[in-house]
Amino acid sequence: MSEIKTYVIRAIVTFNASHYPMKQKVVKYVRALNEKQALEYLYSYLGSKNKVKRYNIKIEEIKEIPVEEAKDKTVRDLAKLNKIIM
């Protein structure tokens, strides 16, 4: 069974590209099995919350980090769980 890892993704996102483009740096902490899934989650998250197209997201860095270094409390709490009952 694969182990879930914690990734930090740094990107530059162009918001409102069609009218008045505004670039902004984004840092997102993600729990995923590999870098590809972490990147896909970022695209999905920014697309659904901010209506940003994939070609408006420029990835600067994807790095695996220890759970303790994650600044997002939700990510740290999810890492502590042994199992989830639905």
From Swiss-Prot:
Highest taxon above the source species: Archaea
Keyword tags: Ribonucleoprotein, Ribosomal protein, RNA-binding, rRNA-binding
One Pfam short name: Ribosomal_L18A
SUPFAM superfamilies: RplX-like
Gene Ontology CC: ribonucleoprotein complex; ribosome
GO terms, biological process: translation
InterPro entries according to UniProt: Ribosomal_eL20, Ribosomal_eL20_dom
Entries under Gene3D superfamilies matching the protein: 3.10.20.10
GO molecular function: large ribosomal subunit rRNA binding; structural constituent of ribosome
Subunit and interaction comment: Part of the 50S ribosomal subunit. Binds 23S rRNA.
Family in the record: Belongs to the eukaryotic ribosomal protein eL20 family.
The name this protein goes by in its record: Large ribosomal subunit protein eL20
Natural source organism: Sulfurisphaera tokodaii (strain DSM 16993 / JCM 10545 / NBRC 100140 / 7) (Sulfolobus tokodaii)
Source species taxonomy: Archaea, Thermoproteota, Thermoprotei, Sulfolobales, Sulfolobaceae
